[in-house]
């Protein structure tokens, strides 16, 4: 039996402003820092410790992870970073307010862009300043493969191979793993682990900074999964995430 912990980053500045973020490298809010600290304290109270952590190359996930590790007195822990764990790229929606976008295009259309499996938002056009090709953290990513937009299927296509080739061998070696990432990169991984259908994945919402535990059998198939926080806390946090893409009444 193996056990891993998944953790979405704490509230970011654009979460607070209800903006589509994607690959934009925004920081944590004061609340987000507190959420990350609370997550670390919860993991400590529940007796969790880790041998290796994985995260994206975006600061909101990195800072969340560092705060958690500080609470666990484990800042020495080896950490592997990969753009493959980045948030889904939201294309031309990046930076736009979700409620304002819903008011313009309709709640249903924005729900499709946010939560559908295979329909991407409008793509960034060549020359858009949001296409940060020259960012050194993406030095290994060929320009031709740099995303201008992504649907969840595209995110799955980069997350799952990373899981299988990089993370799985570490789990099988007996190392205790923490993955600190993003709402949609975690949705991609959970879809794969739980075998969630393309249609049902629309309803999956990942709350910020709430440790999610997966217990896996010898074949790394989920035996059970659960949040460490109580059900009412998780239900309210998931509802808040679900409501972000709706027009204000």
Swiss-Prot record:
User: Which of UniProt's keywords are assigned here?
Assistant: Gluconeogenesis, Glycolysis, Isomerase
Question: What function does the entry list?
Answer: Catalyzes the interconversion of 2-phosphoglycerate and 3-phosphoglycerate.
Q: Which NCBIfam families match?
A: pgm_1, PRK14115.1
Sorted alphabetically, which PANTHER family does this protein's record hold? PHOSPHOGLYCERATE MUTASE
**PROSITE patterns attached here?**
PG_MUTASE
User: What EC number(s) are associated with this protein in UniProt?
Assistant: 5.4.2.11
Q: What class of enzyme is it?
A: isomerase
Q: What is this protein called?
A: 2,3-bisphosphoglycerate-dependent phosphoglycerate mutase
MF terms in GO: phosphoglycerate mutase activity
At what residues does the UniProt record annotate the site feature described as Transition state stabilizer?
A: 182
Query: Could you give the subunit structure recorded for this chain?
Result: Homodimer.
Please name the InterPro entries in this protein's record: His_Pase_superF_clade-1 (IPR013078), His_PPase_superfam (IPR029033), PG/BPGM_mutase_AS (IPR001345), Phosphogly_mut1 (IPR005952)
- Report any one BP term from Gene Ontology: glycolytic process
Natural source organism: Azoarcus sp. (strain BH72)
Which pathway or pathways does this protein act in?
Carbohydrate degradation; glycolysis; pyruvate from D-glyceraldehyde 3-phosphate: step 3/5
Q: Which HAMAP family match?
A: PGAM_GpmA
The family classification in the record reads: Belongs to the phosphoglycerate mutase family. BPG-dependent PGAM subfamily.
Q: Which Pfam families does this UniProt record tie to the protein?
A: His_Phos_1
Domain of life, per lineage:
Bacteria
Report the catalytic activity: (2R)-2-phosphoglycerate = (2R)-3-phosphoglycerate
Q: Does the keyword Transport apply?
A: no
Positions that bind substrate: 8-15, 21-22, 60, 87-90, 98, 114-115, 183-184
The catalytic residues are: 9 (tele-phosphohistidine intermediate), 87 (proton donor/acceptor)
């Amino acid at each position: 039996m193996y056990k891993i912990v998944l953790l979405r980053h704490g509230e970011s500045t654009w979460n607070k402003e209800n903006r589509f973020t994607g690959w934009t490298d925004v920081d944590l809010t004061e609340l987000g820092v507190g959420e990350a600290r609370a997550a670390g304290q919860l993991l400590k109270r529940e007796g969790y410790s880790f041998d290796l952590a994985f995260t994206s190359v975006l600061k909101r996930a990195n800072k969340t992870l560092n705060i958690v590790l500080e609470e666990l007195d484990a800042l020495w822990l080896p950490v592997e970073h990969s753009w493959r764990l980045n948030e889904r790229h939201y294309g031309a929606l990046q930076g736009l307010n979700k409620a304002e976008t819903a008011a313009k295009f309709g709640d249903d259309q924005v729900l499709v862009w946010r939560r559908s499996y295979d329909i991407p938002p409008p793509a960034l056009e060549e020359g858009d300043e949001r296409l940060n090709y020259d960012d050194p953290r993406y030095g290994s990513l060929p320009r031709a493969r740099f995303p201008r937009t992504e649907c969840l299927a595209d995110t799955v296509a980069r997350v799952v191979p990373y899981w299988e080739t990089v993370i799985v061998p570490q789990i099988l070696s007996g190392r205790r793993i923490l993955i600190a990432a993003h709402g949609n990169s975690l949705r991609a991984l959970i879809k794969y682990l739980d075998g969630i259908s393309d249609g049902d994945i629309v309803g999956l919402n990942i709350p910020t900074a709430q440790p999610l535990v997966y217990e896996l059998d010898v074949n790394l198939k989920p035996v059970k999964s659960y949040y460490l926080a109580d059900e009412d806390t998780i239900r309210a946090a998931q509802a808040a995430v679900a409501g972000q893409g709706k027009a204000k009444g």
